[in-house]
Amino acid sequence: MKRIIMIYLVIFFGLSIQVAYPYWIWTPKVKKWVNPKTAIRPTPKEQFAFARSLYELKNYEEAKRELKKLIKSYPKALEAAESQYYLGLIEETQSNLYEAYLAYQKIIDKYPFSERIQEIIEREYKIAEAFMTGTKRKALGMALPVENPAIEILTKVIENSTYGPLASKAQYKLGLVLKGLMRYYEAEEAFNKVISNYPDSEWAKAAKFQIASCRAALSRGPDYDQGATGEAKDKFEEFVKEHPDAVLSRDAQKNIEDLKEKEAEANYNIARFYEKQKAYPAAKVYYDDIINNYPDSKWAAKALERLRVMEKRK
């Protein structure tokens, strides 16, 4: 029985050695056994060349492993920054856009000397645009229920290059993302920064329109806000006055008409309230205001009709 057990043990260890052996190779140069999976080339230049060759062969997972080994073993080498860049490229190629952004951002944070900084900012901006147009952040192929990553990425683009060529555009697009999420106060703040920080940019004019649009959206909430409606109308009128030939001025004029209609409706409802309370003088003030200040609205005719009804009651 002992002999049989010994035979099994010999076979087991023999197989174990056979399985394990290929992972360890004797290297005469350093005179020791090394594991190819964890081994690193003697210089960062050689390691990077090897990793890039794997990338060019589209062996992305192996390339990622070798690039990470370089960064870990030679963190201060010039090749470390380039390795981090290639990690971003691989993630982007594999459609892992948020992970690509994180990889690119590490270059700006850890390797500000890199010659690729402007290119990286541009890549980050394009990733943000992808998220703006509907791309979802995913894990294991499934969309994650998280805030639109475009907010974080655009904020970083602005931070990375406050007065760079993409800064004003990123600031404006940040406002659009927030507006699309109905975060109107934050959106208005973002648009205001376009005007204050980049007054001469091509986006400043559109930002003024968007501020008025945010105010208009607030006025359409479940609780009518007369102040927000008036402010929105004033902002649109200011925009039309300053930019009469702008394409957006036509939209602004339409918004002004809609807001006037809304103001007239609000005044009509107030007048009806006073009329029902038999406070006829107060009701007449509001009906007259509609007729005089909103003559083209549908509420003007209704106000005139109510005045005639009240007149008959005297």
Residue positions per predicted region:
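Bacterial N-terminal signal peptides
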Residues: Y8-S16
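Short helix-onset patch at the extreme N-terminus, typifying the N->h transition
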Residues: M6-L9, P28-K29
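Positively charged n-region of N-terminal signal peptides that target proteins for export
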Residues: M1-I4
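Acidic, polar-rich low-complexity tracts and alpha-helical solenoid repeat scaffolds
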Residues: V19-K314
